[in-house]
């Protein structure tokens, strides 16, 4: 009985294990089937290709950008420039941006350049206004006013010429000449000839002659003095004296001193000084340089890094 019980237990265990295994297998199979069932959707690749056409459709959409709506807007902008007749505002706007870039200094120059343009624009409107109507009136009025002044002198001249005509008559000229010599004309010309011209030329002619005579006496004096030049010929003998030669002799005497031994001593002293450097001490002095070089190499790197 015990064996049977044991056998039944074992069989139940085996059955349970088998059931578990079968269930697991089924589950794995179901899962495998599911996994296999899922691949089929990927196999429905045709739909994606069908969906792929939409991209071409999207590419077909670009034509909308091809539509001219946007260009019309810029065209309209170019149509607006007619108001550009008020061009000063745009330049003013374009000139104002630079100041922001150069915060303090540029503003002043920009303002300077801003002020000139207005005057330039002002003449244009004035010209326009002139061409509209003012031009004719202005020149006409100008030409109307000048003639009067021109005529004004003419009348005066006419008045002058009006009085001469009477003198043109035979008796009139005689009276005119007589009258001129009597008082009006004579005084002016007589006064002119009496003092201004005569004194000046007389004084001029009086002063020049003396200078002309002065050179003659000078020449005369020169001709009187020529004899002294003969003493000049007498003076040459002094140069003949031997004093000059002594100077060159002294010059030749001076070179010898440099040739004396004194100069050599100086070079000897120079040669005496070099030997000390030849002593062994200098090498030790040269030994320090390595550390200096090392120190120099240590210091430069930081600047390079910076």
UniProtKB/Swiss-Prot annotation:
Lineage, top-rank taxon, reads Eukaryota
Q: Which GO terms describe its biological process?
A: plant-type cell wall organization
Task: Locate the compositionally biased regions of type Pro residues.
Answer: 38-122, 133-152, 183-214, 225-290
- Work out whether the entry's keyword set contains 4Fe-4S: no
Species name = Daucus carota
The entry's function note states:
Structural component in primary cell wall.
Q: What is this protein called?
A: Extensin
Disordered as annotated region, ranges: 33-306
Q: Does the keyword Cell membrane apply?
A: no
